Curated annotation (Swiss-Prot):
It holds the Pfam family DUF1414. This is UPF0352 protein Asuc_0778. Belongs to the UPF0352 family. Coiled coil: none annotated.
Length: 71
């Protein structure tokens, strides 16, 4: 999703592979997968980001997601 990142493609791909494997293990359809991933993002924001930064980071994430699906 991000074009510029401090993380290597190898790091991102490894985590992505593991997350896809979990969703496949549970035979999660697209809707359930999106619900789980959305809840994960919400949990990360709530547990790891200061309250005053949560909305801005959520908006930046949303914008990046929208940009990644635009054609």
């Amino acid at each position: 999703m991000a074009k510029n990142s401090k993380y290597s493609d190898k790091q991102v791909d490894a985590v992505l592979h593991d997350m896809i494997a979990v969703l496949e293990k549970h035979q999660a359809p697209v809707e359930l997968s999106l619900i789980v991933l959305g809840n994960m993002v919400t949990n990360l924001l709530a547990s790891s980001v200061g309250t005053h930064q949560q909305a801005a980071l959520a908006q930046a994430f949303s914008d990046a997601l929208m940009n990644s699906v635009k054609k």
